[in-house]
């Protein structure tokens, strides 16, 4: 039992770090127009613009006030495409658990509407849950674990959604119906520290939010993502309430 508790604590420790793309590629500039950087003097998490007023991120990225940076590609350079908008509300899912990182989803209301343009566009919420085998793109400014990849420039990675059995075998007893795994069981490609809260987009829909995992790109330990499709009712009702 002690060892199990230790394993869960390690998982929580990884999950509360800011998650980065390993084994990916630099995104084509402004191809992920929904991607945002959450900033509190530094980039600490990603997020996804879902309409001009709201951003979806991970609940474990919660801070009471954040600056949302939109239209970014290189977060260390002023490129002229950026919009910096402070939050007016930050709302974690009411059933979020920091113990097992369950229901790891959060809404951020912008203090003013984002200006939609070539560099800033929302991503659609899912119309249904994507099946195993669906190819998706995860993106972020996290730790690339590479001496050559520039993590200041948005990194992308194409990953498949894994089956529940593969996911549960990787993390026995830890996967809830609010989570899914995506990536490669052989390792080498994954989201990692600095990507947390960022998007997993499949066929133009936001299916996942970068949530947790053991290490980065480790064999047998794929990335774990919040399953956005089961939160549609909460997302739409919460956005309508504020």
Curated annotation (Swiss-Prot):
Its EC number is 3.4.21.4. This is Trypsin-1. GO terms for molecular function: metal ion binding; serine-type endopeptidase activity. It catalyses: Preferential cleavage: Arg-|-Xaa, Lys-|-Xaa. It is found in: Secreted, Extracellular space. GO terms for cellular component: extracellular space. Its cofactor is Ca(2+). Residues 16-20 form a propeptide. InterPro entries: Peptidase_S1_PA, Peptidase_S1_PA_chymotrypsin, Peptidase_S1A, Serine_Proteases_S1, Trypsin_dom, TRYPSIN_HIS, TRYPSIN_SER. It holds the Pfam family Trypsin. Residues 1-15 form the signal peptide. It comes from Salmo salar (Atlantic salmon). The keyword Protease applies.
């Amino acid at each position: 039992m002690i060892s199990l508790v230790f394993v869960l604590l390690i998982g929580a420790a990884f999950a509360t770090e800011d998650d980065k793309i390993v084994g990916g590629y630099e995104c084509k500039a402004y191809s992920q127009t929904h991607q945002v950087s959450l900033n509190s003097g530094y980039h600490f998490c990603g997020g996804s613009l879902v309409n001009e007023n709201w951003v979806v991120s991970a609940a474990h990225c919660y801070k009471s006030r954040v600056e949302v940076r939109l239209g970014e590609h290189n977060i260390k350079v002023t490129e002229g495409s950026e919009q910096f908008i402070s939050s007016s509300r930050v709302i974690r899912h009411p059933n979020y658990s920091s113990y097992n990182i369950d229901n790891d989803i959060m809404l951020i209301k912008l203090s003013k509407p984002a200006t939609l343009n070539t560099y800033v566009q929302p991503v659609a919420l899912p119309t249904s849950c994507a099946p195993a085998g669906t190819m998706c793109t995860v993106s972020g400014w996290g730790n690339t674990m590479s001496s050559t990849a520039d993590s200041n420039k948005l990194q992308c990675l194409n990953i498949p959604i894994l089956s529940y059995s593969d996911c549960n075998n990787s993390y026995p007893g830890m996967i809830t119906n609010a989570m899914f795994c995506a990536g490669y069981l052989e390792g080498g490609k994954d989201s990692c520290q600095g990507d947390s809260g960022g998007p997993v987009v499949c066929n133009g829909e936001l299916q996942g939010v970068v949530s947790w995992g053991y290490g980065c790109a480790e064999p047998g330990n794929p990335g774990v993502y919040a399953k956005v499709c089961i939160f549609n009712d909460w997302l739409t009702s919460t956005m309508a309430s504020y």
